[in-house]
Amino acid sequence: MDWIEREKKHILQTYTRQKVVIERGEGCYVYDVNGKRYLDLVAGIATVSIGHCNSHLVERLKEQLEKLIHISNLYYTTPQVELAEKLSEIAGMDRFFFCNSGAEAVEAALKFARRATGRKKFVSFTGDFHGRTMGALSVTHKEKFRKPFEPLVSPVEFAEFNNPESLEKVVDEETAAVIVELVQGEAGVYPADREFVKAIEELREKYGFLLIVDEVQTGFGRTGRWFAKDHYGIEPDMITMAKAMGSGVPIGCCALKEEVAEKIQVGDHGSTFGGNPLACTAALATIEVIEREGLVENSARMGEYFVKRLKESFENVIGVGLMIGFDVGDAAEFVRKCLENGLLVNNTSERRIRLVPPLVITEREVDKAVEIMLN
């Protein structure tokens, strides 16, 4: 019995997997159990930001494994404090709640919004994806994700993405928070217009709701800036982050401004594993590599080059840093053929391809990827 048959026998079938068993990775490449090499433009869905098995990350994790893996938030640990201080520097936020994933970060943000405002209602947008747990799912728009699990958290209303007039119709004095992806990832890579973001800011001023920016997919250099919010010059009340934060080691975070944080009390939320020493060390090491190797700048530079190359042959190419989407005739077939030819890509719909490679990708690897796609 092979690995795929064994998986089907024992693992809950919640994923549509490509027919390849990945065994190891290095940089922008992964290798299957037969030794075949693949250029990886998925990176664990925008997660393996500094490349597979980065040597600095591995060494830092080894050191921490020999010291302390886990204790509890009943006690203080140094990596957690160091990480919070570093995040304050790069994200411009004041307080941090650590958890294990993007969905958990969103759940925390929703709870904190209700606690801080005393209001109940949330507003999200068409095309937004915030996670699959019950709260995060409640502010996720796509019906196929939501319908089987209703009733969800309420009240929640959806406005049309990039439509200020639509938003104005649904926000009011009862709105606790507006949550938004400034670059929609699961929808296929669609950035928010500047006028739309300005409208959100003006309505926040008028009604006093909190602004939650979901940076789970866009954070840590993915868009060519540390965070997508940096493109717009805005100051959210909360930011959710995860994915690339630990470059493959599970860690998430809800970052808060002091005005929100001061209204959260001891016992309002918690996490057994959140902020454990190993995960925080992974995040610190990831940030160290991003800074040392100039990966935020590389994301902007390589993203621009990748988009230029793709526009020569594909339709509706949109890119923000190394978060890129484009259209093909049959996306599932395109993914399958790329896989056969040693290239990992991802489709978000019947026609839309999403590329979110490691931030260490080079011009040579971009050229190789485009060559495979065209062939």
From Swiss-Prot:
Record: residues binding pyridoxal 5'-phosphate: 102-103, 129, 214-217, 272
One annotated Gene Ontology cellular component of this protein: cytoplasm
Necessary cofactors: pyridoxal 5'-phosphate
Subcellular location: Cytoplasm
Pfam families documented for this protein: Aminotran_3
Keywords, comma-separated and alphabetical: Amino-acid biosynthesis, Aminotransferase, Arginine biosynthesis, Cytoplasm, Pyridoxal phosphate, Transferase
Protein's pathway: Amino-acid biosynthesis; L-arginine biosynthesis; N(2)-acetyl-L-ornithine from L-glutamate: step 4/4
Swiss-Prot/TrEMBL catalytic activity: N(2)-acetyl-L-ornithine + 2-oxoglutarate = N-acetyl-L-glutamate 5-semialdehyde + L-glutamate
Residue numbers of N6-(pyridoxal phosphate)lysine PTMs: 243
MF-aspect GO terms: identical protein binding; N2-acetyl-L-ornithine:2-oxoglutarate 5-aminotransferase activity; pyridoxal phosphate binding
Annotated positions binding N(2)-acetyl-L-ornithine: 132, 271
Principal EC category: transferase
InterPro entries referenced in this protein's UniProt entry, alphabetically: AcOrn/SuccOrn_fam, Aminotrans_3, Aminotrans_3_PPA_site, Class-III_PLP-dep_AT, PyrdxlP-dep_Trfase, PyrdxlP-dep_Trfase_major, PyrdxlP-dep_Trfase_small
Similarity comment: Belongs to the class-III pyridoxal-phosphate-dependent aminotransferase family. ArgD subfamily.
More details: May also have succinyldiaminopimelate aminotransferase activity, thus carrying out the corresponding step in lysine biosynthesis.
Protein name, UniProt field: Acetylornithine aminotransferase
Organism from which the protein derives: Archaeoglobus fulgidus (strain ATCC 49558 / DSM 4304 / JCM 9628 / NBRC 100126 / VC-16)
Gene: argD
